[in-house]
Amino acid sequence: MDEARAREILAATGLPRTRNAELLALGENAVFATAGPDGPVVKIGRNATDHPELLERARREVALASWLAEWEVPAVRAAEPAARSVDGHPVTVWHRLPAAVRPAGPADLVALLRLVHALPTPSAFSLPRRELLGGVERWLRLAGDAIDPADADYLRGRRDGFAEAAATLTPYLPVGPIHGDALPRNVHVGPDGPVLVDLETFSADFREHDLVVMALSLDRYGLPAEAYDTFTAAYGWDVREWPGTPVLRGARETASCAWVAQHAPANPKALDEFRRRVASLREDDPEVRWHPF
């Protein structure tokens, strides 16, 4: 799905003020801010015709927003009560957040994670397990001939190996609701404080999933050591002490490589980043810098 196709879907929603909508993000989803200071934000997923789980995920994300509001967890709020399906694409509509007053940092993230990790499992709907590796095959197929078939097979092998290893893990923390992609980029700091955004990976699983993300950021994405120390001190525990961390880290690295691969057919920078990531995994070098994409 490129920007042109996403704008076609946006226009087909029939929502007002979509013609000059601002593209905020284009990755797994396309996210648009419609015109006007109070115009809603529209999130468009990839075609779900052959992947009905994408529509189910969008429906669950809207339900989650209402549930988090009931528990007074600061998070994005849906502007419509249910997800739509527009020409096969999941579409959700959200209230626009006030302008950010500053970038989010680890302290903002950890404050929200502590709230999420204290939540019970919802009773009105079910949360899935955090299937870190569930999208690998779909992403590799979208990459097609743009990537080396040997690299695709290598990632499939890693996927299978880490899936098997993850099934044997014993958590240190209680199992329960998690964000699933716990990074400062998924926190918006407005005038009233930090707000959690991008709820589609919310799951019920090991809380360690949410902590491994920052440990990986320290090694792969240039997170300063002081920032990581702030995060662990505020949370009260460093996930690197847990023996299961290398398994969850390896699974996440595998998924991150495959996720970038889906953009390779249309974006040379994505292909370069994919090759960098796969090479570092093949060489077993855990400190090669990866670039956010």
Go through each PLM region and give its residues.
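ATP/Mg2+ or Mg2+-diphosphate-binding catalytic cores
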Residues: 46, 138-146, 150, 258-293
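A conserved alpha-helical element in kinase catalytic cores
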Residues: 3, 43-86, 100-115
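Active-site acidic catalytic loop and adjacent metal/ATP-binding pocket
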Residues: 24-43, 163-211
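Juxta-kinase regulatory segment immediately upstream of eukaryotic protein kinase catalytic domains
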Residues: 1-20
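A cross-family kinase active-site recognition segment
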Residues: 100-153, 173-175
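Conserved short submotifs of the Hanks-type protein kinase catalytic core
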Residues: 88-99
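A short, glycine/Asx- and small/polar-enriched loop/turn
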Residues: 27-28, 36-38, 86-90, 251
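Active-site activation/catalytic loop segments of kinase-like enzymes and analogous catalytic loops
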Residues: 207-240, 251-266, 280
